[in-house]
Each structure stands twice: as structure tokens, then as C-alpha cells.
Amino acid sequence: MIDEETVQKISDCGIRSIGISIDGGEKTHDTIRGTGCYQKAMEAFGRLKKAGIYCSAVTTVMKNNLEELADIKKELNRAGVDAWQIQLGIPKGNLSDSPDAVVEPGDLEKILDFCYQAADGSLSIHMADCIGYYSKKENALRRLNCPEGKIPVWQGCQAGLSHLTIRHNGDIVGASMCPPDMTEGNIRERTLREIWEDENAFAWRRKFKPELMEGFCHDCQYLSLCHGGCSAIKIFTGGSITAENKYCLYRNTMLGK
């Protein structure tokens, strides 16, 4: 719970941005996260904003909240949230027991259309790296959020290349959706610098060979840049990091999916 005392500690630590999961309207969110969690999250946004902390919401899109995105946006605007990340629920964690809740590849276009239309400046909308790639609307959204000097085009999974995730127990992984067997070390045992600079760390990404990609991805014109998209999507929906990425807008457009 992010109460006033916690907000003060966050501020004192110099943390500038906080992200909180909002996975639907109150009923849907509480079904997923627990009774009362939605209201606590909204109250937390209010306290954080009052303290001048940049607030982000993260929504994991599943079949049961796909039609609630517009209503979620209204509530986030009302709460004064600064940014909103929309990401796909993939069959891992709790969703590994509920594969029917995972959106289909054919739903990507609907999600993209919503993000494109919702990018009205009221809050910054970001599609997570598991949503893409190489469509006009997706590129337009990337341009809106692209830092100066950066190229607004998907350039492959950056896990282990330019960013990493520190889990609650200190484990280091390339991205939050990486499976446990992709853990590179633990900050309670080695320093972050030692782990990051280890020549064998993140080998699955740093030494990835795109020519090993399968299916449509193998012959795709964007392969050298894309490397098959989000690594976690490939692993959890295709079974391996070289599996064809069926959650790709470009692929599905070209194949008429």
C-alpha cells in the first residue's frame, strides 16, 4: 500500500517515476488483483501526484479487459496519470493456467487502433515492446514518444542490450517477462556492474543469431533490424527464442491474418 509515509520515502529516495498496474475497471481489476486493490491504486496516484511524482499506469491486455480500454483511459485522465503503458498478457505466471484469457494475434489490430486514436495528448500512451511491428500507425505512435536523437522505429528487443530488470528478490533478468532460467545473477551476490559487464551475461540476446529465426520471420525483410520482436512473446507463445512471432502486425498483414 502506498500511503503518505511511503510516498515521503519515495520522494526522499529521489525516485522520480512510479508505475502502478491498472488491469481494468474496478470490478475487473479487483477480480485480478484482489478486492479493494483498484481503489487503493487510484488513491496512490492521488498521493503521488500531490508529491510531484510522475505517475504511470500499466495495463496488461487480456480478453476480459480488451473492451474496457476506453473506460480505463477516462479513469486515468481523471486521476491525473501522466503516462499509460499497454502491454499484452502472455501465457506465463497466472496466465499460464488460463491460456484462454490471452488475446489472439488477430486482436493486435484492435489494440493498435485504440492506442492510435487515444493518443490525443491527454496522457502519454506507450505500447510495450510486445506490441508491434512496422505498421504506419505503430510508427506514428513511436514518433510521438521518441526521445530527441533516437530513431522512432522498432530496432529489436533491448533486453540485455540497453536495459535490464531487477526483481523483488534481487535477481537480474533482461526484461520483466523473462522466465527464471534466464536469470543472470543476483545483486545480493554480485554487483550490478559485474553482472552487466560479464562477457557471458545475456548471451541469449547479445549473441542472438537472427538467421536462426523460424517461419515468416526467417525471410522477413525486417529481420536484421527486428530480430523477431519481443523475446518473451516468442518464448511463451512459440516455445523458443527463435520461434516465429505470430504477434506481429507486419507478419499478419502480409499473410492476411
Segments from the language model and where they lie:
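Cysteine-cluster motifs in flexible loop/terminal segments that predominantly coordinate metals
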Residues: 211-257
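A structural motif corresponding to the C-terminal lobe/cap of the Radical SAM core domain
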Residues: 78, 82, 97-123, 153, ...
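C-terminal accessory region of radical SAM enzymes
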Residues: 106-143, 171-221, 227, 237
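Short, acidic, Ser/Thr-enriched surface-loop or helix-capping motifs
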Residues: 166-167
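Radical SAM/AdoMet-radical enzyme domain recognition
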Residues: 1-104
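Short, small/polar residue-rich loop motifs at catalytic or cofactor-binding pockets
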Residues: 157-161
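Short, electropositive alpha-helical surface patch
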Residues: 67-85, 136-156
